[in-house]
C-alpha cells in the first residue's frame, strides 16, 4: 500500500483568477487567512513534501514553499500545473490540490493513497456525486501522456483521465470538502458555511 510519506504534493495556484477580478487567488483572504495558507495547513498535517505551482507572484509564494511555474505558456489550465509538478517533484507519486478549496479534509492524503492499486496511474477524489478532477494523485509514468496531451492543445483533464488507468477515492463522507472559492460572491456566500 502506498504510504503518504512516499508522496509529494503540489498546491495549484497558477490560474488567472478571472472570476476573482484577476487578483491572485492564493493571497485572497478567507476567514482572516490567505487561501494559500489554508491549503498549506491542509497538507502540512499530512505530509512534509509540499510545493506550489504558480505563474505569477512566484517570489511571494516562495516564502511558503518551493514554487515553480508551468512549463507550457499561455495558461493552459490546471493540467499544465500538474505536468510541472510531476516533472519537478522527486517522488514517483505526486498529489495536487487547488489553492481555493479551504475545507479539504485532514485525511485527504491517506484517502487518496489508500485507493492506489498496483496498476493505478491516477487517483481522483470523488464526493459521491461528482469527480473532483483537481484533487488528485498521479504517478510520474504519465508524464509522456500529459506532455503529448498539452502539446496537441488538449486541456480537459477528464479526457486525460480516460486515457489512463484512473481510479476514484471515496470522499462521500465529506460533502462540503470541495467547495471552491472562485469569486468574491462565493467567498461571502460560503464564509458562514465553512
Curated annotation (Swiss-Prot):
Main location: cytoplasm
Binding site for Mg(2+): 100
Biological process terms in GO annotation: bis(molybdopterin guanine dinucleotide)molybdenum biosynthetic process
Top-rank lineage group of the source organism: Bacteria
Alphabetical keyword list: Cytoplasm, GTP-binding, Magnesium, Metal-binding, Molybdenum cofactor biosynthesis, Nucleotide-binding, Transferase
Pfam families: NTP_transf_3 (PF12804)
GO-annotated cellular components: cytoplasm
Entry cofactors: Mg(2+)
Reaction catalysed by this enzyme: Mo-molybdopterin + GTP + H(+) = Mo-molybdopterin guanine dinucleotide + diphosphate
SUPFAM superfamilies xrefs: Nucleotide-diphospho-sugar transferases
A GO MF term: molybdenum cofactor guanylyltransferase activity
InterPro entries for this protein: MobA-like_NTP_Trfase (IPR025877), Molybde_CF_guanTrfase (IPR013482), Nucleotide-diphossugar_trans (IPR029044)
EC number: 2.7.7.77
Enzyme class: transferase
Family designation: Belongs to the MobA family.
Oligomeric and partner information: Monomer.
NCBIfam families in the record: molyb_mobA (TIGR02665)
Role according to the record: Transfers a GMP moiety from GTP to Mo-molybdopterin (Mo-MPT) cofactor (Moco or molybdenum cofactor) to form Mo-molybdopterin guanine dinucleotide (Mo-MGD) cofactor.
Domain notes: The N-terminal domain determines nucleotide recognition and specific binding, while the C-terminal domain determines the specific binding to the target protein.
Name of the protein: Molybdenum cofactor guanylyltransferase
Gene expressing this chain: mobA
Amino acid at each position: 500500500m502506498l504510504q503518504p510519506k512516499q508522496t509529494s504534493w503540489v498546491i495549484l495556484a497558477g490560474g488567472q483568477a478571472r472570476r476573482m477580478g484577476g487578483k491572485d487567488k492564493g493571497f485572497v483572504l478567507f476567514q482572516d487567512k490567505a487561501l494559500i495558507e489554508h491549503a498549506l495547513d491542509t497538507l502540512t498535517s499530512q505530509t512534509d513534501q509540499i510545493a506550489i505551482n504558480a505563474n505569477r507572484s512566484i517570489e511571494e509564494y516562495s516564502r511558503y514553499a518551493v514554487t515553480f511555474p508551468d512549463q507550457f505558456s499561455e495558461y493552459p489550465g490546471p493540467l499544465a500545473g500538474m505536468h510541472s509538478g510531476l516533472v519537478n517533484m522527486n517522488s514517483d507519486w505526486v498529489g495536487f490540490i487547488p489553492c481555493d478549496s479551504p475545507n479539504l479534509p485532514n485525511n485527504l492524503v491517506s484517502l487518496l493513497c489508500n485507493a492506489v492499486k498496483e496498476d493505478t496511474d491516477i487517483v481522483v477524489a470523488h464526493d459521491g456525486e461528482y469527480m473532483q478532477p483537481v484533487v488528485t494523485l498521479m504517478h510520474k509514468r504519465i508524464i509522456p501522456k500529459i506532455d503529448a496531451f498539452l502539446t496537441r492543445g488538449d486541456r480537459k483533464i477528464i479526457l486525460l483521465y480516460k486515457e489512463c488507468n484512473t481510479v476514484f477515492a471515496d470522499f462521500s463522507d465529506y460533502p462540503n470538502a470541495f467547495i471552491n472559492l472562485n469569486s468574491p460572491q462565493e467567498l461571502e456566500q460560503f464564509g458562514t458555511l465553512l
